């Protein structure tokens, strides 16, 4: 029976996570900047969107289940600061936040489950982004405690083009070896064209310790997403369906001038 259960689970996972020709979904959590300096405005904006970053395609997003910031281990609920915005016909969310203390600010979002008809499963991506305040580099590698998350090993801000980025993928606080991590460039203005489909989404795998590595080739916003199958299912029209959970992290890369 254990063998049958394992086989069934693997089949469901393969169908839900690796449907041929399906575009990669990413939960967006993109601030107006990754570093707030003494001369900058202390108020930043954050876009909370559900999208295909490279292709510039968006999907409707309901108001998140959770949205907050963690500074030096202390969490603040920011859910009620979100306001709905439209990107074309699609619903997205935006918030303003005023930085009051030095140190790293870890913003995080847990969206409500998104039903993906094409993949016959729900999608829940837990996204994070780190914004540095006033040059005090404290807290960027702290864990928020999300169901699944990427814990950076490389400081996730102040990155130059060509820097190597590393992170650990965790589910329920435990590293996940041998899992795929999808990587995409946020092609905001659509100027970058991929000569072939495999170049839209880059893919790397975690090692035996759950660590992945990627050398970032271009300035701009990049996102990493490690996908897993949740142990629990959700009902859709009375039938239990699998849930794809994703650990998502956004980083900004700068050209050296």
Language model segments and positions:
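Bacterial N-terminal signal peptides
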Residues: 8-17
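Sec/Tat signal peptide C-region and signal peptidase I cleavage site
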Residues: 18-24
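Beta-strand-rich domain onsets/edges
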Residues: 24-45, 120-179, 185-190, 236-257
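Start-of-domain marker
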Residues: 24-81
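Short acidic/polar inter-strand loop motif in beta-rich domains
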Residues: 55, 112-119, 230-236
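Aromatic sugar-binding surface patches on proteins
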Residues: 84-95, 208-211
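Short, aromatic- and glycine-rich surface loops/edge beta-strands on solvent-exposed regions
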Residues: 95, 101-116, 222-228
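Short, acidic Ser/Thr/Gly-rich low-complexity loop/linker segments typical of extracellular
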Residues: 190, 194-209
């Amino acid at each position: 029976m254990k063998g049958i259960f394992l086989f069934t689970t693997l089949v469901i996972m393969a169908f839900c996570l690796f449907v041929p020709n399906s575009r990669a979904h990413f939960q967006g959590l993109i601030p107006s900047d990754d570093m707030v300096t003494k001369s900058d405005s202390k108020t930043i904006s954050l876009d909370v969107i559900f999208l295909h970053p490279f292709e510039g395609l968006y999907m409707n997003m309901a108001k998140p289940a959770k949205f907050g910031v963690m500074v030096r281990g202390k969490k603040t609920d920011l859910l009620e600061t979100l306001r709905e915005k439209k990107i074309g016909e699609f619903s997205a969310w935006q918030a303003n936040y005023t930085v009051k203390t030095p140190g790293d600010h870890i913003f995080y979002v847990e969206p409500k489950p998104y039903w993906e008809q094409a993949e016959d499963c729900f999608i829940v991506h837990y996204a994070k982004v780190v914004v540095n305040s006033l040059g005090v580099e404290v807290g960027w590698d702290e864990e928020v405690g999300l169901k699944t998350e990427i814990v950076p090993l490389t400081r996730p801000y102040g990155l130059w083009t060509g820097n190597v980025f590393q992170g650990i993928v965790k589910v329920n606080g435990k590293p996940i070896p041998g899992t795929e991590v999808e990587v995409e460039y946020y092609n905001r203005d659509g100027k970058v064209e991929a000569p072939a489909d495999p170049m839209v989404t880059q893919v790397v795998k975690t090692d035996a310790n759950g660590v992945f590595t990627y050398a970032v080739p271009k300035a701009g916003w990049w996102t990493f997403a490690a996908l897993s199958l949740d142990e629990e299912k959700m009902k859709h029209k009375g039938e239990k369906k699998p849930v794809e959970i994703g650990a998502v992290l956004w980083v900004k890369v700068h050209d050296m001038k």
